[in-house]
Amino acid sequence: MAFTLTNKNVIFVAGLGGIGLDTSKELVKRDLKNLVILDRIENPAAIAELKAINPKVTVTFYPYDVTVPIAETSKLLKTIFAKLTTVDVLINGAGILDDYQIERTIAVNYTGLVNTTTAILDFWDKRKGGPGGIICNIGSVTGFNAIYQVPVYSGTKAAVVNFTSSLAKLAPITGVTAYTVNPGITRTTLVHKFNSWLDVEPQVAEKLLAHPTQTSLSCAENFVKAIELNENGAIWKLDLGTLEAIQWSKHWDSGI
């Protein structure tokens, strides 16, 4: 179902990162009512730039680390909902790429995403009288086929795809729809230098960047297109400047 971002309220976790900041710039061009950015480190210059792009959009920043206990996330969301009354879209975009940091990679890329999603369901779940909402989770093409030198990172992204696909199937119960956007290799600081698992490939970043990549701007443009297409359960691939819906193969069914 096509979705217009005009006059909508959007929460963007990690909306000041490489792909995140360029996506935030595209979002404010769509005449949002509010863009609420949750990120670990404040960037006043970036916030000012977003406000300058479209002064009609209210851009707000709150410090947020996705690895905090879920109770802290719920407290922050309560503050945001009290201010805005309604939130239309949650974008979960926090991510790190460093297979030296096993626990933190899992905590940021997967557990934090699950906890933030779980927390917002308290406000959105129609079983609790909520209005429903839209969740856009940022995965990666490595969630389809791993970069085998970074199996921890790739594994977290596969988990994001699976979790989000389950959320989408639960929409008739919760009223909350969900989909993933899965960027290919994008030229950001995330991929300029990173560590492989157990140092199996010390030059993994250099070798990866020797192959075709995309700019964060082209990725961001397709990111927002995916949000506007608003297809529950979609698994979007954003690679080399293109946007493509992935058809997932079913090899097993729980039967329930």
Curated annotation (Swiss-Prot):
Keywords: NAD, Oxidoreductase. It is an enzyme of class 1 (oxidoreductase). InterPro entries: ADH_Drosophila-type, NAD(P)-bd_dom_sf, Sc_DH/Rdtase_CS, SDR_fam. GO terms for cellular component: cytosol. The active site is at Y153. Pfam families: adh_short. Disulfide bonds: none annotated. NAD(+) binds at residues 12-35. Its EC number is 1.1.1.1. GO terms for molecular function: alcohol dehydrogenase (NAD+) activity; aldehyde dehydrogenase (NAD+) activity; protein homodimerization activity. GO terms for biological process: acetaldehyde metabolic process; acetyl-CoA biosynthetic process from ethanol; alcohol catabolic process; behavioral response to ethanol; NADH metabolic process. The keyword Transcription does not apply. The keyword NAD applies. Substrate binds at S140. Gene3D superfamilies: NAD(P)-binding Rossmann-like Domain. It comes from the Eukaryota. Transmembrane segments: none annotated. It catalyses: a primary alcohol + NAD(+) = an aldehyde + NADH + H(+); a secondary alcohol + NAD(+) = a ketone + NADH + H(+). Belongs to the short-chain dehydrogenases/reductases (SDR) family. Homodimer. This is Alcohol dehydrogenase. It comes from Drosophila erecta. The gene is Adh.
